[in-house]
């Protein structure tokens, strides 16, 4: 599912996006940086995009999220890929928006467009709703999920789990610590060489570093 399809889903649900909605053209109230962090224009506030709230079971009247904990842009600022999460493949507006003011207090911006509208039922009837899917934490350090883009038909996202050998995990850990758990532009040559030597794709390495930097990364 591309960005246009995702925005059409929000329109078809009959609910307007929350304030601060960022369109594909990039004309929004905020601008984002790497790691789901941005700064609002004209206001000294930092913006973060936290867990993904997209409802993948809206077509069957249920509620299920993918477990992505924080937005991570797939591309550089100013590109369409910058609005797409590299971890879950969803548009940035599906992630919970959190604004941190100068004083350091976080303000959560509510998101309304992820839960499907409930059909009206006359009083006196038992109202049944589908149970929410249990929270699924990010993949452990031994395995990593490489998420493909959702199909245009709106079906469930396919996930392919990548298995790493002990040698690959050891090399990725050492390489991630050397880069400071973040791939920057000047690291492209080293990353390409590392991927060629280990057989791990760049995108898989990037997602692995994102999911494991808090659990495996050295404390400052």
Curated annotation (Swiss-Prot):
This is Zinc-finger homeodomain protein 2. GO terms for molecular function: DNA binding; protein homodimerization activity; zinc ion binding. It is found in: Nucleus. The gene is ZHD1. Keywords: DNA-binding, Homeobox, Metal-binding, Nucleus, Transcription, Transcription regulation, Zinc, Zinc-finger. Residues 157-220 bind DNA. It comes from Arabidopsis thaliana (Mouse-ear cress). One of its GO terms (biological process) is embryo development ending in seed dormancy. Homo or heterodimer. Interacts with ZHD1, ZHD3, ZHD4, ZHD5, ZHD6, ZHD7, ZHD8, ZHD9, ZHD10 and ZHD11. InterPro entries: Homeodomain-like_sf, Homeodomain_ZF_HD, ZF_HD_homeobox_Cys/His_dimer. Mostly expressed in flowers and, to a lower extent, in inflorescence, stems and leaves. A zinc finger (ZF-HD dimerization-type) spans 49-98. Disruption phenotype: Arrested at early embryo stages. Transmembrane segments: none annotated. It holds the Pfam family ZF-HD_dimer. The homeodomain differs form the typical one by having namely 4 instead of 3 extra amino acids inserted in the loop between helix 1 and helix 2. Residues 1-40, 100-160 are annotated as: Disordered. It comes from the Eukaryota. GO terms for cellular component: nucleus. The record marks 209 as: Required for DNA-binding. Residues 1-11 have a biased composition (Acidic residues).
